[in-house]
């Protein structure tokens, strides 16, 4: 399979099984992050593995950040339990006169999406999650982020269910997205 084939067949899997890659299995995917285009090689990112109780603590941070109570708090708290492994993607701003913050954040975003593609290609179910609580103070605190760090979101990773629906995407009208300046 070519890289193009892998990208074209990639789809999010919002329902995954309890299987998840081990830390050892993740290491090559983390190493591959060094290949993302990165002006000045700043590596303005880091990844955080969340398993087990860390997911429960994230759920509590979601509930706190949302201000929800009762069933709504339970619902917010259950969101991180949809996969056995969550990989938090963190933008780490590095002081640089050559590379502005927006460009560094773009590198961290590239790391996130490259991880998603690699995990999908390896046969794992992956979906990307963000939302209004992503950069809230309780969620920031739960991830033990430094002042120069911002959370971008999470890759939820698990096994693929036996019956996985094929994503029937509409074909892209490429002419709308690729224009030419003359």
Residue positions per predicted region:
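Short, electropositive alpha-helical surface patch
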Residues: 138-152
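C-terminal helix-cap and adjacent tail motif
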Residues: 3-13, 17, 151-182
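Short, charged/polar surface micro-motifs in flexible loops or helix N-caps
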Residues: 52-57, 64, 93-95, 137, ...
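Small-aliphatic-rich amphipathic alpha-helix that forms the alpha element of a beta-alpha
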Residues: 33, 87, 93-142
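N-terminal amphipathic, basic helical "cap/leader" segment at the start of enzyme domains
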Residues: 1-83, 180-182
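Structural motif
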Residues: 84-87, 153
């Amino acid at each position: 399979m070519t890289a193009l084939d892998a990208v074209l067949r990639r789809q999010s899997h919002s329902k995954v099984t309890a299987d998840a890659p081990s830390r050892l299995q993740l290491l090559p995917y983390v190493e591959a992050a060094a290949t993302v285009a990165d002006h000045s090689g700043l590596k303005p990112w880091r990844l955080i593995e969340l398993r087990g109780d860390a997911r429960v603590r994230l759920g509590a941070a979601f509930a706190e950040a949302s201000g929800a109570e009762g069933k709504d708090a339970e619902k917010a708290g259950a969101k991180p339990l949809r996969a056995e492994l969550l990989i938090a993607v963190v933008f780490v701003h590095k002081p640089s006169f050559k590379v502005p913050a927006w460009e560094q954040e773009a590198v961290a975003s590239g790391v996130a999406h490259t991880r998603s593609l690699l995990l999908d290609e390896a046969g794992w179910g992956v979906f990307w999650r963000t939302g209004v609580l992503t950069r809230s103070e309780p969620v920031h605190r739960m991830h033990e982020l430094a002042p120069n760090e911002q959370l971008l979101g999470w890759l939820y990773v698990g096994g693929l269910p036996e019956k996985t629906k094929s994503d029937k995407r509409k074909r892209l009208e490429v002419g709308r997205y690729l224009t030419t300046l003359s």
